[in-house]
């Protein structure tokens, strides 16, 4: 990369990044938090945060990167994608004021508590089973890629570990105070560190728990933007340290700074992967929507589908194996835009931007329903569902649309199943006469139906 090419890339980076940052800041000042703000920050992080790191690697360590023309295409495609996304998100699809609709479901106090207990049990039981089969993989494996080898059993169980976080979110939303907020941080980060050691270096649960803690603090006004910035720097350093442990790296001096730059870029902002994909554009055989349904294969156990393909050719694996001919054992993240290019080229970038705008719009609608819900138990369930889907949005920005669709469907099914089981258990308890009246001063001040645990709302 020459200085002239760097100057051109810097100009485009400033214009596109400034455009997205301005819109995000305006939205933040208006609402403090919604999923448009969150996705916009993720988008900035994924496609723009890595540019300065790449430049330092190029000019400070003489690292060879993707040719500048493809990096330029990556920045321009990110800017165009966000513009289409933002217009879609802001387009009103129906009138603002509508007559109140009949609630689709109700939740009482016992059902809410049973729901979070079941989700926590799902996570704890699957972690325990995985541990009994494999032990602490962090101290047993020589390379991180060995996590995906045949020597590790019960890999499918990892997808259930995450449900500890929405369980703790329900606990927080049932009693929204600073004590519950701090307990959420301690509980979820401790669980994340446990899964980090057991699985062998997976940091997702730690990152998500800390991010949710910060966003809740911003919403409630318990932390300021300066505190958020300092926490972000601390999180980057912590993720770097965990990455060193994951890859068994021992570095110092300038080598440590170099390692910090490329690991931080690859962890938070794999934007160069999009440039690399665009560089190999002529080698792509467009996959259509096939990567979306192929990604569901990982959720089907082999004992249920004996002929299940051993290789799941989603957009990340197609990019890694077929386009780059890389068989190192780890898939290279194509990013959201890259996955759309794999599916259908430039046309799919525009269609994908519209679809993502509608997805984020739906999550914001559901989140607002949860905030306005008068029943505190139903509100806790709705808001924990929305915040629990944060992991899926990180997958959307980093891994692509196909990975997002399969994971969000899985999350919805398991979350809904936990709530349905909770309602069934409550019905059985109520039928057995085990639901007793709540006695105390509150009963004297409320209607008869609210004195019963089962009808508390």
Curated annotation (Swiss-Prot):
It is found in: Cell inner membrane. It holds the Pfam family WzyE. The keyword Cell inner membrane applies. It is a multi-pass membrane protein. The chain crosses the membrane at residues 3-23, 41-61, 65-85, 118-138, 154-174, 181-201, 206-226, 227-247, 340-360, 377-397, 408-428. It comes from the Bacteria. Keywords: Cell inner membrane, Cell membrane, Membrane, Transmembrane, Transmembrane helix. One of its GO terms (cellular component) is plasma membrane. Its main location: membrane. One of its GO terms (biological process) is enterobacterial common antigen biosynthetic process. Pathway: Bacterial outer membrane biogenesis; enterobacterial common antigen biosynthesis. Probably involved in the polymerization of enterobacterial common antigen (ECA) trisaccharide repeat units. Probably part of a complex composed of WzxE, WzyE and WzzE. HAMAP family: WzyE. Belongs to the WzyE family. This is Probable ECA polymerase. It comes from Erwinia tasmaniensis (strain DSM 17950 / CFBP 7177 / CIP 109463 / NCPPB 4357 / Et1/99). The gene is wzyE.
């Amino acid at each position: 990369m020459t200085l002239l090419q760097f100057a051109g890339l810097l100009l485009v980076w400033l214009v596109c990044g400034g455009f997205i940052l301005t819109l995000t800041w305006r939205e933040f000042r208006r609402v403090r938090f919604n999923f448009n703000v969150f996705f916009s920050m993720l988008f900035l992080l994924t496609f723009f945060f890595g540019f300065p790191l790449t430049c330092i690697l190029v000019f400070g360590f003489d690292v060879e990167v993707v040719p500048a023309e493809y990096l330029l295409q990556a920045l321009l495609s990110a800017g165009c994608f966000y513009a289409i996304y933002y217009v879609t998100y802001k387009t009103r699809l129906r009138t603002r004021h509508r007559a109140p609709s009949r609630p689709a479901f109700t939740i009482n106090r016992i059902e809410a508590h049973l729901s979070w207990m079941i989700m926590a049990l799902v996570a704890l039981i699957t972690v325990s089973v995985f541990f009994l089969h494999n032990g602490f993989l962090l101290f047993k494996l020589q390379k991180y890629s060995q996590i995906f080898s045949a020597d590790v059993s019960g890999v499918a169980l990892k997808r259930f570990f995450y449900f500890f976080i929405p369980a703790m979110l329900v606990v927080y939303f049932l009693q929204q105070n600073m004590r519950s907020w701090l307990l959420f941080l301690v509980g979820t980060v401790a669980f994340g560190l446990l899964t980090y050691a057991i699985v062998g270096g997976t940091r997702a649960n730690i990152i998500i728990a800390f991010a949710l803690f910060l966003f809740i603090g911003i919403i409630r006004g318990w932390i300021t933007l300066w505190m958020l910035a300092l926490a972000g720097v601390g999180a980057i350093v912590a993720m770097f340290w965990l990455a060193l442990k994951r890859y068994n790296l021992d570095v110092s001096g300038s080598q440590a700074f170099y390692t910090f730059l490329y690991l931080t870029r690859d962890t938070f902002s794999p934007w160069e992967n999009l440039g690399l994909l665009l560089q190999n554009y002529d080698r792509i055989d467009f996959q259509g929507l096939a990567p979306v349904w192929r990604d569901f294969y990982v959720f089907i156990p082999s004992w249920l589908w004996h002929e299940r393909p051993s290789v799941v050719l989603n957009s990340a694996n197609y990019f890694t194996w077929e386009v780059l001919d890389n068989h190192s054992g780890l898939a290279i993240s194509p990013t959201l835009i890259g996955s759309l290019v794999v599916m259908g080229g430039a046309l799919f970038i525009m269609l994908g931007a519209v679809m993502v705008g509608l997805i984020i719009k739906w999550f914001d609608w559901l989140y607002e329903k949860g905030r306005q819900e008068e029943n505190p138990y139903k509100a806790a369930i709705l808001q924990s569902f929305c915040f629990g889907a944060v992991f899926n949005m990180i997958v959307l920005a980093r891994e692509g649309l196909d990975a997002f669709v399969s994971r969000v469907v899985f999350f919805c099914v398991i979350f809904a199943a936990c709530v349905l089981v909770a309602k069934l258990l409550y019905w059985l308890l109520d039928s057995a006469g085990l639901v007793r009246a709540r006695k105390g001063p509150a009963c004297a001040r409320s209607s008869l139906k609210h004195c019963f645990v089962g009808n508390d709302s």
